[in-house]
UniProtKB/Swiss-Prot annotation:
BP terms from Gene Ontology: L-histidine biosynthetic process; methionine biosynthetic process; purine nucleotide biosynthetic process; tetrahydrofolate interconversion
Similarity section: Belongs to the tetrahydrofolate dehydrogenase/cyclohydrolase family.
Top-level division of the source organism's lineage: Bacteria
Protein name per the record: Bifunctional protein FolD
Source organism of this protein record: Tropheryma whipplei (strain TW08/27) (Whipple's bacillus)
Amino acid sequence: MVAKVLDGLAVSAGIFERLHRACCELENNGVCPKLATVLVGNNPASRSYVLSKHRDCNNIGIQSTLIELPANTSEKELISKVEILNASSDVSGIIVQLPLPESIDQNKVIEAINPDKDADGLHPLNLGYLVTGKQGIVPCTPAGIVKLLEAHRITLEGKTIAVIGRGTTVGRPLGILLSGKGVNATVINIHSRSRNISGLSRIADVVVACAGVKHIVEPSWIKPGAVVVDVGINQSGVSSSGKMILTGDVHPLTKNIASYISPVVGGVGPMTRAMLMSNVINLSERDFRKRLYAS
């Protein structure tokens, strides 16, 4: 058995089409959605990802602006830039590209973003809404993973799902999202201090690998027929043609055991970007409704 592919490119294409129509409708009402991205330093991977986000904006019809700051930018200077964007009436959504230099407290910067402009869905208020089940802005990658599975008609309700990794951008919010009333799965949160990691993973119907460790998930960790979602994007050198070699958190031979598996390229990545664009549109629509009711 060779696993079927969880095709994030195909699923995201349909989402982008819907978002383009929503953007046109907003423009017809005099609203121009706009995403502001702040990039600190010159990390090649971060720069490449930011540029891909802005290409998505252009394709959908969302305006975008990129604020580039040097690597030696102080935490105070960065937060000051964020506050300027918070006060800008033409900016619908804000993202500060992660990771940030070690000298900057990532949490303080995220907390400085206006929750009503938090396009990444990582502000404590929006994460709190996720916990309580109140409708808010959901972190992009967790939302994208759920959409990807739903698009392939993979039932999650009542299933046991192992989430390997407990980062604040994927692992933790994904566990909350999957165990919430909207999905109703049983979630096993696995991390580096967990005992019997392989055994815990092997009982799961769905395994989501988001540890950021190359090929940490071995074929022996997967029960036959399980669904595997590989979130990992690990840089493993450069090819002879000069292209960056990317590897996931899941060993390639796992495809011979799983029923479905997401590819490293074209799996979760396009879904994350689609959910970011969806968040920007949602923030624009919310702001439009607020102003409409206030008038």
